[in-house]
Amino acid sequence: TTDVTKAISWMGYLGIILWVIGFTIEVTADNQKSAFLAKEKNKDNFINSGLWAWSRHPNYFGEILLWFGVSLLALPVLSGLQLVTLVSPVFVYFLLTKISGIPMLEARADKKWGGSPNYIMYKKNTPSLFPSKP
């Protein structure tokens, strides 16, 4: 560790804002999905309301956003080998979009609801990760 202290710059404030937005999106999406699944009538349905109308995986978008925010906040005080830590948000993005997370959930959803016209339209019109107005 080092004893480097610096005043928070515009980059740090941007990092804080991204972290707060990302955290809020992730928690809100998780809460919306939990509330949806808690209702018996939704037991075998997919969620397509709230943040889930904007993205098929808004919780992962929030997760990625908050880690980019942490990196921006930390960047001004990192040096040398510490800069390797900046790979973290890229790794989280890669992991969630290419390895686990989205690919696994999409395969499971396709198997479960792939024959549903509503699901086919939802998947066609709703971005996988980056939100877009429905």
What are these regions (language model features)?
Residues T1-Q32, L37-P134:
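Hydrophobic transmembrane alpha-helices
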